[in-house]
């Protein structure tokens, strides 16, 4: 398969089951909603070392938020429910409770309920007050700028993590330009995040390592500087490879985001140095969700 001169490899991405939640952060204005949400979703690129994977899903108009203020929705993913609940509580307490004018609400109603303000309320030292509105409980916690309003719980659902594709280009600037175009398109798709910095990964990994203590190591087959030292997947003209990783609330959401991103990257075409699209294929060792590139782009 070739799209605008870009070869689409006959391969697939592998992804794995996760647990996820969505929360809504509001504030006096969008700038401060972003400050809180960006802090809450920081250091959350990979569950390998960060405890969770998280990112901002989209901005919300006042008409879309529970308190009628500007806001953003954020998605958080972890391998299990206990881990997700702990990460959410820690991040909410350290990054949203602390942020001026912020409030925090559930973004998913269904599924197992995990604490949001249920435990954060104790920061109020007995001065906290609960309110029940429309069958939902909220906590008003006194803080120095006024009150922090936080919904008691949010819903946790089954989700999918680790969808991905690789962009292979003639140069680093060209690979990055294609990634930026892809991310811009993918951010229009609901229910997904691309958790790495700017949505892009340069240090793609393979399972295992020559060092016994490492569960993953550099994907040497796709490293352009190692063409003469390893079983390379790269042809001579490829000098840069970058990866986009996607977490989604369903496999269908990830497939939509992958299609949008690949279409955008291929829009630049071979004339702009984009030569191939591939994916992280680990022979079925990583996860049960398989995203075949050519099926997605058919």
UniProtKB/Swiss-Prot annotation:
Pathway: One-carbon metabolism; formaldehyde degradation; formate from formaldehyde (H(4)MPT route): step 4/5. Its EC number is 2.3.1.101. GO terms for cellular component: cytoplasm. One of its GO terms (molecular function) is formylmethanofuran-tetrahydromethanopterin N-formyltransferase activity. Its main location: cytoplasm. It catalyses: N-formylmethanofuran + 5,6,7,8-tetrahydromethanopterin + H(+) = N(5)-formyl-5,6,7,8-tetrahydromethanopterin + methanofuran. It holds the Pfam family FTR. Keywords: Acyltransferase, Cytoplasm, One-carbon metabolism, Transferase. InterPro entries: ForMFR_H4MPT_ForTrfase, ForMFR_H4MPT_ForTrfase_C, ForMFR_H4MPT_ForTrfase_fd-like, ForMFR_H4MPT_ForTrfase_N. The keyword Transferase applies. It is found in: Cytoplasm. The keyword DNA damage does not apply. One of its GO terms (biological process) is formaldehyde catabolic process. Homotetramer. Belongs to the FTR family. Catalyzes the transfer of a formyl group from 5-formyl tetrahydromethanopterin (5-formyl-H(4)MPT) to methanofuran (MFR) to produce formylmethanofuran (formyl-MFR) and tetrahydromethanopterin (H(4)MPT). This is Formylmethanofuran--tetrahydromethanopterin formyltransferase. The gene is ffsA.
